[in-house]
Amino acid sequence: MRTHGDRARGVAMVAAAVLAAAVAGTPVNADASSLPSVKSGARPGPDILYAPQVDAPQLQNAGPWTAPPILVSGGEAYRGGEFLYQDFLYDDHGATGTQDPNDPFSEVEQLFSPKHGTLTYPTDAALANNAADLVELRVKPLKSETAFRVTLNTLKAPDRVAFTIALGDSPVARAWPDGAGVVSPAQLFLTVHGTTAALTDATTGAKLAPAATATLDSARRQIEVRVPHAAWNPGSSVVRMAAGVGVWDAAAGRYAQPGPTATATQPGGGVTSGAALFNMAFRTNEPVPKIYDPGIANTIAEGGALVKEDGSWWRERRQGDVLASGDVSEFSAEVDFSKLARRANDDSGVPKTGHIDRIFASKYDFGQGVDYSVKCLTSTASECTGRYVGQLQPYALYVPSKPLPAKGFGLVVSMHGLSANYNEFLGSHEAEQLGDRGTGSILASPESRGPDGGYKSYAEADVFEMWADVARHYKLNPELTDVTGYSMGGEGTYELASRWPDLWARAFPIVGPPTSAASFTSLRNIPVLAWYGQTDELVGPEMSEQAFLNAMQAGIRYDHWVFTPAGHITEGNNDEFGPAATFLGGATVDRNAAHVTYVVDPSLDTKADSATNHAYWLSGLTNRAAGSAGEIDVVSHASGVGDPPVLPVALSAGTLNGGSHGPVPYQRRTLDWGPAPAIPKADQLDVTVTNLSSVTVDAPRAGVSCNPKINLKSDGPTQVRIGGCPALPLPSNHACVDRRKFTFKLHHARRARVVAVKVFVNGKRRVSRRGHDIKRVTLKRLPRRKFKVKIVATQSGGSALISTRTYRGCTKSRPTTRGRHHRRS
């Protein structure tokens, strides 16, 4: 049996250009070549994939602070005279003790993303179940002071939060002050609550003068502390530091002491050691999850027990155990003040390859903290914000230890299952096998704002915001992009592949409930490998069979494996994905397919994403009957390649070898295509439409002219426009036009005639004409001031040219001979 400890997790130097930009404080924006692009027509995917980087307040600098954040959790760096530590998000669960019976963190709702620590926050809403969640800690020497800055994920009640920084070494561990309940080596302790700061001697407890000062930046959720050199001067020495965050009890003047059950003022889930801290800094060696290895699990119940035992899903396994022991000595950093003095840049403490957790700033911000009352699974609302409501969101990566390919790494978007989190695949062979294939691909897993978002609304938007963030920090080849997911993530794979089909080369849903039969037709140009279990207790054989029937009805390429026997957890726990890596291979996205089928379902569109009204070289898809789905099927004859025949179902069987379960038998049914036949090349489009009133075809990408022959079959009125062509030329608008009479010629494509024209002025139709060959249009009685002219000219062949321009009306004087004398000859 393989163990994850046997895997190499090499750390390479970060790309020089990215490091240089980071230390200079320049925002690292996505290389345009790292995101999908087309020469004309609609961009693939939703608009949020291409949105600019968000400037979140928590990531901003003010005052003496200038270095950009690391945004790699568990990383340490020296940047431009500052030392930075980046913590993990939502890891503030404290010591591992006895579970609080009223803990709002439900072990059922988060069965596959359990926490290891047991501390619970006081029930006061001001603490938002997240008040002591450390985001970042910084240190910077100033002229006469040493500055520290702590950034928190939530800061609604500054007077209820405290942190302590242990400074210096000692031969024996010292008790942290103010009831923190832990010990570590230290010479001094700096404790801050609200805007009160105290520097104390670790041996005597005496307060040192002059006093440290603390300032609060509520908007950025940052607390800055300055210690005068007269009280403590590190000079150019190397100083040992440790730090922890907890809840402050103002009435008692100390850290709030955990009891068995949380009250409005006291935490619950306490431990016998009395550790009162929720979150420790400098945890650079938190273990990654083991995907249940070496335990064996087939059912959900068996898998849930193993993930609970593992306890690494929020990257706080060591934190929980160490806090429970009361001795936090292992969580420390050696801060070199000589490096800080010479403003050295050193990112060697930041993971570059292997299994990594990152942080990005979302466009969406629904408040602070964690709202456990939000349950997307059972919500009837179309928009669900998820329980992790803040602007900062985490995601997981596997970055292969390979040379960067000339065009960049591929990308595999991997979505977690119901009740799991973004770290579900961290540390897995799946991540490594899919990532290490070929020239290398980065595997990225979103949190999607909670355990049950179903990759709809804001959970779906989180996927694309994550993708955009990956593209900001790594060079990607967007032609090598695949999508996969487990259980709910498998359903999300079907969902995202069918909604945004021109983003993906291949799709790999694992035990995923299928989406609608109609949606499978949108997968025409995406080969799919699907794995299911014969004895799956959640996604049973009937769902597996429905997925296969959907694929067969749609006539797509679909490789359907059913492991026998296998429960809902077997494939993940077995953790062997060699055949999937082979299937994904080096396949590239086909963005300009000759045959496009797409379902337009506005009921799936949400405020979080742009409408799914475009795919491949089709855009402007508008449903005729609002609220009902529409479908379009378009074949371009320009390539001279016809539809390949759908081959008969191929049956086979085998065993999957190499995983933790040993040989796992499977039955396989494969739907594939034969060789594509040659057809006569023609400037022709065959368009079949249901419940769509309009569509725009991008001519260059479809391979046709601006005046192709269009064979249209529709169940109602449908306008087919041809885009990607020169717009209908209109007269210049540099000068005003005569409002009494404005005439312009109708230019059109070569060998075409304008057979119908509609002209709108400020949205009102002024002209509607039909004819054999319309050459010009005249407008009269135009507005005196600015007005907008829109012309829709239909050419022979059915394509439409549309142009819009704004003009300014005026009354021009006409030549006159009145008052002049003429000499006759």
Per-segment meaning from a language model:
Residues 25-34, 143, 207, 339, ...:
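Polybasic, low-complexity, intrinsically disordered segments
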Residues 34-77, 169-188, 232-323:
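Acidic/polar low-complexity flexible segments
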Residues 35-198, 248-255:
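Surface-exposed, glycine/proline- and aromatic-rich loop segments on solvent-exposed faces
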Residues 282-399, 553-557, 564-729:
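Alpha/beta-hydrolase-fold serine-hydrolase catalytic core, especially in secreted/extracellular enzymes
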Residues 389-392, 401-411:
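Proline/glycine-enriched tight loop/beta-turn segments at coil->beta junctions
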Residues 401-407, 454-488, 498-504:
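Gly/Ser-rich "nucleophile elbow"/oxyanion-hole loop immediately N-terminal to the catalytic nucleophile
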Residues 408-473:
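Active-site machinery of serine-nucleophile hydrolases
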Residues 529-532, 536:
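Short beta-strand/loop motif that positions the catalytic acidic residue
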